[in-house]
Design a protein with these regions (language model features):
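Short beta-strand elements that form the blades of beta-propeller/WD-repeat-like
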Residues: 1-16, 50-63
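Repeated scaffold domains used in trafficking and secretory/extracellular systems
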Residues: 1-6, 36-48, 84-86
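Hydrophobic alpha-helical segments, especially N-terminal targeting/anchoring helices
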Residues: 4, 24, 72-73
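Repetitive beta-architecture junctions, highlighting loop-to-beta-strand starts
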Residues: 19-21, 67
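Aromatic (tryptophan-biased) beta-strands that constitute blades/sheets of beta-rich domains
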Residues: 22-23, 27-38, 80-83
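Short, compact, well-ordered microdomains
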Residues: 58-86
Length: 86
């Protein structure tokens, strides 16, 4: 379990299947989940000073890369492709 520095929520990666992120509020209560983007399998969380990222391993390359960092927006329960993971 890792704390998102933006929201203060706790984020856990459940690796079964394509993977999903489980979200918990600051008190530890379940607050939702985020599924892997289509065509990706969630691999691991990456902590940076300003935000929490998750690496998605793609089935096919996008702009020459299979693996991408996705920014996690806990409040809207979305992932946004942020840059290649290498």
């Amino acid at each position: 379990v890792t704390i998102d520095p933006v929201s203060g929520f706790r984020v856990a990666l459940r690796p079964e299947g394509a993977g999903r992120l489980l979200l918990f509020d600051a008190g530890g209560a379940p607050a939702g989940a985020i599924e892997a983007p289509p065509g990706y399998r969630l691999s691991h969380l990456v902590e940076t000073p300003g935000r929490l990222l998750v690496v998605g391993q793609g089935e096919a390359p996008v702009d020459g890369w299979h693996d991408w960092h996705f920014a996690i927006d806990v409040r809207s329960a979305t992932l946004t492709r942020a840059g290649p993971a290498y």
